[in-house]
Structure formats: structure tokens, C-alpha cells
């Protein structure tokens, strides 16, 4: 199949756009002048890729998606901010992903091997890691950080500047306004949709190959933070001591990830 056969004749591609020879573009798709698309990427029909957007290798972009649009920020003044997407991501139908703003670092970034389902919104300046899952209709506001292997349930909403740690899970239809530590499940409680902590993501960690010793250590740290009478500062001190006393290197590293994350919180952790 030639390059001409892979680009539908109704697609509108700016002459300045840079597409690898094997990129596939569906019918009525529009690609702007400052877009770069690497090898193996396939873009469905009726899709818009615009702005200063870079798509890596072997991405799959669904029909009617809007990728690289202007940020929904009233302070935006047409600065040349960017969207950078890595490799092997799946971005399904009607998803919207916006470029960054000058008030942050000017970049919205998405790593590799992410699974982004239909109707997801990823706002300006978000930083998405690798191997994440965004279920349909998950909506994240500006400046949100999502760590590797995190999962966001369908119809969940995330407040701006919130951080979701690696291997964390946010339940469906949950509203999240504070940080979720790594390895923790947060989901809506009875009588409302505000997310609250619901233990360590044991099943997810087992699937990722975490050992029983690693999981036991994380459950102990979770109990210190959430199930004790300790203040936040006291719990941090106890978890730091737990890190120092843990001899198993993988367990110590997981605990350090947990401890460093909660120490860096600015919005507070989910309660």
C-alpha cells in the first residue's frame, strides 16, 4: 500500500505538517501546520490534530477525537504551547486533549502505552505517565499529574493540580479534589461522589508482579497514614522510619515512593 492510499483524499493536511511515510489518516480529518506524527500512527476519520502537537510511533487515534486544541484557560493568549504524546497510545473516539499554557511549563505530556477510552478529557498542562487507563468519560482538569499504571474509572472527575500516584486507582463516578498516594484505591463513599481512600490496590499490584512482602509493607504504611491516631506529620515520620528499617530493596523502594509522594503534597491527600 502506498502513502497516497493511506491518506484519505478528503483529509485536509497542512503542507507544513510532518507525517512519517506510513502514517494513516482517515476521511475528513484535519491536521494543522505545526503537527509532527511519527511512524506507524493511525488516525481515524473526522479527527482534528492541531496546535504544536507531536505524536510518537504506533499511536491509534479514534474517530472524532480532538488532539492538540487550544487550552480552556481564559489566560491563554495564543502562546505556542505544546502537546507531546509518546508511543503506542490508544486514544478513542471523541476524546479531547489540549496543549499547555504559559503559566505552567507550556506542555501537556502523555507517555507511552496508555489506554484512553471514549469521551475522555485531558486538560492543559496535564502530565500523564505510562501504562495508564482512562475509562470512558473520565475528565481531568488542568495541571493534573497521573503516575504510571494508574487507572481512572468511568465518569470520574479530577480537580486541577491534583496528583494521582503510580499504581493508584480512582473509582468510577468519583470526584477527586486531593492527591491519591501511589498504590492506593480512592472511590466515592456512600451518599455522595467525593472520593475517599479504600485501601491498597492489592489486586493491581499482584497483577504487576509485586511481591507479598512489598504489598505487606505498603499495607502497613497505609495503616499508619489512614488507620492510626497519628497526625499527618507523625504518620510521615513513622513511615520514614519504616523505610529506613526495611531490608528488602524492592519493598524499601516502594515504601520510599509512597513516602516521597505524600511529603510533596500541596493540596493534601485524599481523606
Curated annotation (Swiss-Prot):
Q: Which reaction does it catalyse?
A: a (3R)-hydroxyacyl-[ACP] + UDP-N-acetyl-alpha-D-glucosamine = a UDP-3-O-[(3R)-3-hydroxyacyl]-N-acetyl-alpha-D-glucosamine + holo-[ACP]
Its Gene Ontology molecular function terms? acyl-[acyl-carrier-protein]-UDP-N-acetylglucosamine O-acyltransferase activity
Top-level taxonomic group: Bacteria
Presence of keyword Membrane: no
Localization annotation: Cytoplasm
E.C. code:
2.3.1.129
What sort of enzyme, by top EC class, is this?
transferase
The biological pathway it contributes to is:
Glycolipid biosynthesis; lipid IV(A) biosynthesis; lipid IV(A) from (3R)-3-hydroxytetradecanoyl-[acyl-carrier-protein] and UDP-N-acetyl-alpha-D-glucosamine: step 1/6
Q: Which GO terms describe its biological process?
A: lipid A biosynthetic process
Q: A GO CC term?
A: cytoplasm
According to its UniProt record, where is this protein mainly located? cytoplasm
UniProt keyword list: Acyltransferase, Cytoplasm, Lipid A biosynthesis, Lipid biosynthesis, Lipid metabolism, Repeat, Transferase
Instruction: Quote the Gene3D superfamilies the UniProt record gives.
Output: Hexapeptide repeat proteins, Udp N-acetylglucosamine O-acyltransferase, C-terminal domain
What family is this protein classified in?
A: Belongs to the transferase hexapeptide repeat family. LpxA subfamily.
What is known about its subunit structure?
A: Homotrimer.
Its job: Involved in the biosynthesis of lipid A, a phosphorylated glycolipid that anchors the lipopolysaccharide to the outer membrane of the cell.
Q: Which HAMAP family match?
A: LpxA
Which PANTHER family does this entry report, sorted A to Z?
ACYL-[ACYL-CARRIER-PROTEIN]--UDP-N-ACETYLGLUCOSAMINE O-ACYLTRANSFERASE, ACYL-[ACYL-CARRIER-PROTEIN]--UDP-N-ACETYLGLUCOSAMINE O-ACYLTRANSFERASE, MITOCHONDRIAL-RELATED
Protein name per UniProt? Acyl-[acyl-carrier-protein]--UDP-N-acetylglucosamine O-acyltransferase
* Source species of the chain: Ralstonia nicotianae (strain ATCC BAA-1114 / GMI1000)
Gene of origin? lpxA
Amino acid at each position: 500500500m502506498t502513502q497516497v492510499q493511506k491518506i484519505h483524499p478528503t483529509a485536509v493536511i497542512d503542507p507544513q505538517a510532518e507525517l512519517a511515510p506510513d502514517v494513516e489518516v482517515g476521511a475528513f480529518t484535519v491536521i494543522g501546520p505545526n503537527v509532527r506524527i511519527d511512524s506507524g500512527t493511525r488516525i481515524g476519520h473526522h479527527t482534528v490534530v492541531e496546535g504544536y502537537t507531536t505524536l510518537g510511533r504506533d499511536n491509534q487515534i479514534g474517530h472524532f477525537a480532538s488532539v492538540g486544541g487550544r487550552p480552556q484557560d481564559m489566560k491563554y493568549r495564543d502562546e505556542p504551547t505544546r502537546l507531546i504524546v509518546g508511543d503506542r497510545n490508544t486514544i478513542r473516539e471523541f476524546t479531547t486533549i489540549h496543549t499547555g499554557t504559559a503559566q505552567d511549563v507550556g506542555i501537556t505530556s502523555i507517555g507511552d502505552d496508555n489506554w484512553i477510552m471514549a469521551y475522555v478529557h485531558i486538560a492543559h498542562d496535564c502530565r500523564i505517565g505510562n501504562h495508564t487507563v482512562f475509562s470512558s468519560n473520565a475528565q481531568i482538569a488542568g495541571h493534573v499529574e497521573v503516575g504510571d499504571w494508574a487507572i481512572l474509572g468511568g465518569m470520574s472527575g479530577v480537580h486541577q493540580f491534583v496528583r494521582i500516584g503510580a499504581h493508584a486507582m480512582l473509582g468510577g463516578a468519583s470526584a477527586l479534589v486531593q492527591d491519591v498516594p501511589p498504590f492506593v484505591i480512592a472511590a466515592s463513599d456512600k451518599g455522595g461522589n467525593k472520593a475517599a481512600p479504600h485501601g491498597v490496590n492489592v489486586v493491581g499490584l499482584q497483577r504487576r508482579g509485586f511481591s507479598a512482602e512489598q504489598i505487606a509493607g505498603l499495607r502497613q504504611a497505609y495503616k499508619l497514614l489512614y488507620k492510626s491516631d497519628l497526625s499527618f506529620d507523625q504518620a510521615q515520620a513513622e513511615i520514614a522510619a519504616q523505610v529506613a528499617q526495611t531490608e528488602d530493596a524492592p519493598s524499601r523502594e516502594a515504601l520510599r515512593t509512597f513516602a516521597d509522594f505524600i511529603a510533596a503534597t500541596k493540596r493534601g491527600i485524599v481523606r
